[in-house]
A protein has these predicted regions:
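PLD/PLD-like phosphodiesterase catalytic module centered on the HKD motif
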Residues: 1-261
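Phosphate-binding P-loop
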Residues: 262-266
Length: 266
């Protein structure tokens, strides 16, 4: 039997992705689990990306209970948040939240669409989908307010490395390994207990989030003609776009404009 990996969290550590990468610390921490029924992981993150999740997904699929709580953040476009004359404060915040939720959905889809299409990446996504569908990984989104917190909690009965890591890193590839971040791990049982209570309270107020549905589309069979058009666009898209910009100076009928726009959306 292989010797369990001892995670580098034996004391309170600063994790900044320079000397230590959070993805490596979390990977080793989750891999150190004895895989008992008491093992649990709870993650809160304002942002999410598939590339970030896959960095730590392999050990997560083995843990009996994993909860991921996603939040939303206000759009950086300040002009978008101008309060309308007819809005009271509650309506204004509600609109902000709704638009941020929609922006997050678009962001996840964009990250998915730009995810590398190779054998290793496809295998990782399939592993993630299996975990999401079998039920040991559950995802919810907090939609009552903007959730900006980032926390990674691991807990298991009689495990020497129970800990919570709190800081600035989102559950994204950059947050876990590339950006200059600052996170601190803490092993104080009271801190872990209070953080878990905080998490559970928000979890109970959150709504289920079908993360699997975003990635199932990757493996949906595609029309060969659409794939052919995609290949053409990758090869000649820039030239076509330049010609399109030039042609926009010429008058087009409505149906011609509609046809061009549809072609670009493909």
């Amino acid at each position: 039997q292989a010797t369990p990996i001892k995670p580098d969290t034996s004391k309170n550590l600063h994790i900044d992705n320079i000397d230590k990468k959070l993805s490596n610390v979390l990977h080793d921490l989750f891999n150190s689990s004895k895989l008992t029924e008491s093992a649990k992981v709870k993650i809160a993150s304002a942002f999410f990306s598939p590339a970030g999740f896959i960095k730590i997904s392999e050990p997560l699929t083995k843990i009996s209970k994993v909860q991921i709580l996603l939040g939303t953040e206000p759009n950086s476009n300040k002009g978008q948040w101008d309060k309308k004359l007819e809005e009271n404060e509650a309506a204004f915040i509600k609109r902000q939240l709704q638009e941020s939720i929609e922006n997050q959905d678009k962001y996840i889809k964009k990250e998915r669409d730009y995810f590398p299409f190779d054998q290793a990446s496809s295998s990782s996504v399939k592993t993630m989908l299996t975990a999401l569908k079998t039920g040991n990984i559950e995802v919810r989104r907090y939609e009552k307010n903007f959730l900006h917190a980032k926390a990674y909690l691991f807990k298991e009965d009689e495990h020497p490395e129970n800990s919570v890591i709190i800081g600035s890193s989102n559950l994204t590839a950059n947050g876990l390994s590339a950006n200059l971040e600052l996170n601190v791990s803490n092993h104080d049982p009271e801190v872990i207990k209070e953080t878990e209570q905080w998490f559970d309270r928000l979890w109970d107020e959150s709504v289920p989030f079908n993360l699997a549905s975003y990635f199932e589309e990757i493996f949906t069979p595609r029309d060969p003609f659409v794939i052919f058009l995609k290949v053409l666009w990758e090869l000649y898209g820039e030239e076509v776009l330049e010609e399109y910009i030039q042609d926009k100076k010429l008058p087009l009928t409505d149906f011609q404009k509609h046809g061009v726009e549809r072609a670009l959306r493909l």
